[in-house]
UniProtKB/Swiss-Prot annotation:
Species the sequence originates in: Mus musculus (Mouse)
Tree of life domain: Eukaryota
Tissue: Expressed in liver, kidney, spleen, brain, heart and muscle. Expressed in photoreceptor cells of the retina.
Chain segments annotated as coiled-coil in the UniProt record: 129-168, 221-278, 352-590, 622-712
Protein known as: Serologically defined colon cancer antigen 8 homolog
Amino acid sequence: MAKSPGNSTLEDSLGQYQRSLRERANRSIHQLKCALREVDVTVEEDALDPSTSINVENEDTGVAWHELQHSHAVNQLKALLRQQTNKENETSPPRRRKLSPSRPSECDDGSMPTMHNLVPIINDQSQYIHHLEAEVKFCKDELSGMKNRVQVVVLENERLQQELKSQRPEETLREQTFLDASGNMQNSWIMTREDSRVDEAAKRPFSHGDAETGKTASTGDANKWKLELERLKLTYEAKTDLLESQLMLLRKDLAEYQKTCEDLKERLKHKESLLAASASSRVGGLCLKCAQHEAVLSQTHSNVHIQTIERLTKERDDLMSVLVSVRSSLAEAQKRETSAYEQVKHAVQMTEEANFEKTKALIQCEQLKSELERQTERLEKELASQQEKRAVEKEMIKKEVAREREDAESKMLILSQNIAKLEAQVEKVTREKTAAVSHLEEIQNHVASQEMDVTKVCGEMRFQLNKTKMEKDEVEKEHREYKAKSHKDLEMKVQEIEKLRLELSESEQHVEQEQQKAARARQECLRVTELLGEAERQLHLTRLEKDSIQQSFSNEAKAQALQAQQREQELTQKIQQMETQHDKTESEQYLLLTSQNTFLTKLKEECCLLAKKLEKVSLKSRSQIVRLSQEKRYLCDKLEKLQKRNDELEEQCIQHGRVHETMKERLRQLDKHGQATAQQLVQLLNKQNQLLLERQNLSEEVARLRAQLPSMPQSDC
């Protein structure tokens, strides 16, 4: 994780400042320790051997001078102490040396306890500095951990947003490919099954649908229903045309058969009239010879007639067998035609059902697509508005932070001015004090008060650290709960996506099955057309055979008359059968129309149910989106709270740094105060030396005067 430049500069400056403080504290402690050790050594050597103290002290001063060049006040103190000890050793008489240890002990009692008391104070200050540095490090570590966690949360949010953005175009591409494939299949089906007029009517709405994707779903549904109705009308018109053509052919055949029957009837009447005329032209009475001759002729003529009758009966039998075969072939052809008609009818029904289900699936897909587009647009708008709100809130927070910083800086300036005034007052009070002992006692009291303040500050800092730890634990708990909730939500979304994918796969399988059924129906239609072609050929052959039979019937009157009567009966039966078939077809068509109407009503009801289901699904999706938006707002609020807490912790860290700086300034002031006290001590020691010199002079004058006093009475005497 990359740190910001401002944080890096602050950390570098704090580290440098801590190093400089450590070095200065170590130097001052080392100097004071060396000074105290040297003073102790000089006191012990004076007690043991005053004659050798001068040389040892000169050597020690030579070594200490190189070690303590930087502290001028300490060197001056050392020099004054050594001068005082040397003068006392040189000038004090032997009888005064017995009493002298008491006085220096008093001086030492007045001066040395302050130095001994300074050592624990300095040690406590160094410990306090180390404690503050450890606390600052702990605060820095906590801040860095919080920053890392916040950055991890931000990165996770960005990753999730990128995944959502990448999933949306993939889903839209899949839907577009599915719709394009379904549209192409529908166009190809319409091109193969319908006329050019229906093709144009089908192409126009698709082209308009491709060009005008932004229109509502109602207009597209109306156009599709119109196309379906036109297609059904065309199919029924084609069926009616076929039936009418068949009826016309049958009527023509009936007219031809009626004409042949009338011709045969006229011929029979003519022959009967001829037979009656021949019978009437015969003579009544004849002779025996003539009667015998006529009888012979009649027998011969009867034999001829019998032969012709037998021949005609044979031909009639042959023709009847041929007619039976022709009738059987016609019956088979009719059966084939009926089976083909039923197959075509079944295929048409299957295609109609397949087309209807296909249109229904396409309508559902388009409705889902429109709903998804609306949802995506609404979500994008909500995201844009939320981003704008976040930007505005960030700007407001930045302005408030800048204002708070300015207020804090102004407060710090006022506090620094007050501190400067108080320090000036303290310096005035300390200057007014004359006695070094009282001044040192005040210093001790001041140090004790500082220690109390330090302990209070430490307690406050520990309390604040405990607070920060508690807040950190709460933040971690909230973060864990948020992670668990986010994982649950993601799992629910993944399950919903898998359900939708399964539904899409099922719809695709259903469409493929319907396409396979349509292909099978096409194959069956081709087979039926082939069978119809064969039936037409057979009908043509039968017609040729009928023509040949009619030519043979024209030569034979009686047989044709009988056959004509039989044919009339058969034709009447056929006409009755055709009428019954026509009635049946009309009833079947009426039933088909009624069934189709009922089917359409059922489809309308199913469409209404599907629309209600889609509305329910849309309401559910909207409620889920609202819930997700609420959760998003809740998470945004949490993030803002965490950012505010982070800012507060940063401000606390800055305040700790400022407190640290104030403590450093206090330490500097204490150093300055110690230097001032050392200078005052130097001045006091100088005054003490002057007083000792004056005392010595006075003692010498008193001794001289005492020496002069005994001589004065002798001279008087």
